[in-house]
């Protein structure tokens, strides 16, 4: 502009007039707020099914089938196999359905799955024939929500358990998962405010204010201890440091 002798002004003046004539140039960009996924109000209301892939030291491709309760984050059932097919998912689903008496749930539980082949075929037939009475929802197809709840559990099982150990083969991995799933289900979960998945599945109510009285008491005790420290003790610590 100045080189063509059209106008002469400082950079700040240029931006001033640019803002006047086009208010789009100074528009702030904001990141989209994270969306809250689908949430159940009680155990056995929504369950999620998914498969994750893991390779032990012999490089066998292992498929781990998980079924997770939405409300409690508890792993209700799992299977491991070198095959990726709906019959294994159906077997896992049947075991969970019978073990936790889903038949008595009114209305029927929602089964959230992705559009993978392991969730079609025999699984769809069993649901259509009322052998397994659940409502099957395909994530981001039948509903806008993703299947992130069980995907998060897959990630935790990989990074908190599987990837931290040298597992030789699929048999070794299966034995390890028997312990790992038990540990996961009985370990306090951050989303449950200190409760474990098993406790919440069995009736405990997650409450973020549950430990508030103890936290306030601990805070007051820390303040009292800090005030009780004399200047002499502080000076002693400083001299010792020097």
Where are the predicted features?
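Basic, flexible linker segments flanking DNA-binding modules
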Residues: 1-46, 125, 143, 202-205
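RNase H-like DDE/DDD metal-dependent nuclease/strand-transfer catalytic core used by mobile genetic elements
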Residues: 8-11, 36-64, 70-183
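Sequence-pattern detector for short linear motifs
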Residues: 19, 30, 42, 82, ...
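A periodicity- and composition-biased signal for non-globular, repetitive helical segments
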Residues: 22-25, 30-33, 37, 85, ...
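Acidic/polar loop patches that form or flank catalytic/metal-binding clefts of enzymes
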Residues: 27, 107-108, 192-193
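Short linear capping/connector segments at secondary-structure termini
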Residues: 32-33, 109, 197-198
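C-terminal domain-tail junction helix/linker
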Residues: 130, 156-242
């Amino acid at each position: 502009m100045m080189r063509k002798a059209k106008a002469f002004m400082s950079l700040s003046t240029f931006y001033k007039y640019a803002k006047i004539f086009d208010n789009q140039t100074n528009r702030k960009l904001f990141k989209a707020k994270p969306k809250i996924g689908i949430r159940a109000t009680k155990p056995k209301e929504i369950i999620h099914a998914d498969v994750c892939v893991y390779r032990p030291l012999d490089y066998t491709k292992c498929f781990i089938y998980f079924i997770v309760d939405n409300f409690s984050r508890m792993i209700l059932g799992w299977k491991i196999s070198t095959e990726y097919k709906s019959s294994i998912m159906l077997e896992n689903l049947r075991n969970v359905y019978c073990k936790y008496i889903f038949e008595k749930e009114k209305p029927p539980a929602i089964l959230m799955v992705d559009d993978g082949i392991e969730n079609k075929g025999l699984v769809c037939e069993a649901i259509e024939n009322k052998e397994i009475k659940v409502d099957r929802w395909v994530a981001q197809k039948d509903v806008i929500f993703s299947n992130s709840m069980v995907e998060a559990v897959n990630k935790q099982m990989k990074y908190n358990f599987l990837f931290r150990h040298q597992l030789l083969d699929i048999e070794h991995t299966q034995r390890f998962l028997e312990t790992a799933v038990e540990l996961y289900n009985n370990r306090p979960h951050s989303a449950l405010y200190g409760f474990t998945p098993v406790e919440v599945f069995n009736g405990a109510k997650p409450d973020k204010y549950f430990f508030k009285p103890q936290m306030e008491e601990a805070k007051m005790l820390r303040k009292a201890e800090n005030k009780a420290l004399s200047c002499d003790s502080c000076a002693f610590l400083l001299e010792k440091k020097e």
